[in-house]
């Protein structure tokens, strides 16, 4: 059996650190690939990079922008993605109000640096209950981001395709997770996603905002572990059945 690779796709300004709370548990389940979206300016190119640098079946787990990248992966290689987890994300196209606000942050990054971006961006992205230690770690991650990489990712998001009709056509196991305090990608937005994707399951984590993987790592890990285990077992059962049918021909 070719074991499915668990692909963890970070969001805007995020690197692999955002998945620190999940890596230990998930890496014991099978191969894990942490994607890097740096240097690319379209979601399509981000998806292509992942598909080109991995092999075989994939379980795609995307946070925020990473969820949109996961949808582009499915659009390009539907036979390779066997299960999907969407975390604090969406499928709609860019709204009219986004261009100005995103450009303001890009300009701030170029003129004042990523520390200034972190200070401007972070307050509305986390639950008020998020510990100070977690806040500092998230700020450090944002400060590590390159301003030009940040600008490229913002370009990708402003020019993203509207995938609302596409998600309604999905027919693969899908877990949708959000925080109850996410004001950027609201629980209502995720309820709409769950309604659109047939057979999907929605989980709302209490006392967590948009930076859910870091804010509520244990809760998210528990949800992902159960979902991924279920789909790895289904993959094994399917391959066993195929092998048995070949043996009787």
Model-identified regions with their sequence ranges:
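Conserved acidic catalytic loop of the alpha/beta-hydrolase fold
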Residues: 43-58
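Short beta-strand/loop motif that positions the catalytic acidic residue
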Residues: 170, 176-178, 182
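Short alpha-helix in the alpha/beta-hydrolase fold that links the catalytic acid
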Residues: 172, 186-195
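Conserved alpha/beta-hydrolase catalytic His-Asp/Glu region
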Residues: 94-97, 112-168
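Conserved HGGG/HGGXW glycine-rich cap/lid loop of the alpha/beta-hydrolase fold
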Residues: 1-47
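Catalytic active-site module of serine/aspartate enzymes centered on a nucleophile-bearing elbow/loop
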Residues: 200-249
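Gly/Ala-rich beta-loop-alpha elbow adjacent to hydrolase catalytic centers
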Residues: 62-66, 70
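Flexible "cap/lid" loop of the alpha/beta hydrolase fold
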Residues: 43, 75-76, 80-119, 125
């Amino acid at each position: 059996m070719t074991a499915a690779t668990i692909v963890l796709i970070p969001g805007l300004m995020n690197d692999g650190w955002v998945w620190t709370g999940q890596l230990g548990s998930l890496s014991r389940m099978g191969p894990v690939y942490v994607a890097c979206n740096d240097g690319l300016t379209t979601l399509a190119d981000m998806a292509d990079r992942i598909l080109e640098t991995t092999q075989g079946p994939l379980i795609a787990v995307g946070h925020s922008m990473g969820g949109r990248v996961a949808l582009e992966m499915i659009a390009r290689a539907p036979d390779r993605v066997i299960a999907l987890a969407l975390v604090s994300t969406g499928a709609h196209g860019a709204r009219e109000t986004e261009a100005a606000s995103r450009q303001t942050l890009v300009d701030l990054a170029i003129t004042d640096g990523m520390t200034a971006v972190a200070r401007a961006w972070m307050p509305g992205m986390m639950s008020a209950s998020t510990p100070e230690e977690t806040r500092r770690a998230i700020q450090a991650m944002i400060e590590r981001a390159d301003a030009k990489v940040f600008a490229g990712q913002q370009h990708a998001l402003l020019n993203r395709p509207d995938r609302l009709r596409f998600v309604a056509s999905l027919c693969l196991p899908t877990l949708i997770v959000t925080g109850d305090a996410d004001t950027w990608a609201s629980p209502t937005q995720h309820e709409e996603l769950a309604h659109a994707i047939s057979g999907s399951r929605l989980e709302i984590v209490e006392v967590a905002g948009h930076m859910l993987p870091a804010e509520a790592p244990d809760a998210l890990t528990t949800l992902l572990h159960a979902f991924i285990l279920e789909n790895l077992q289904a993959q094994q059962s399917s391959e066993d059945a195929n092998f048995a049918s070949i043996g009787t021909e």
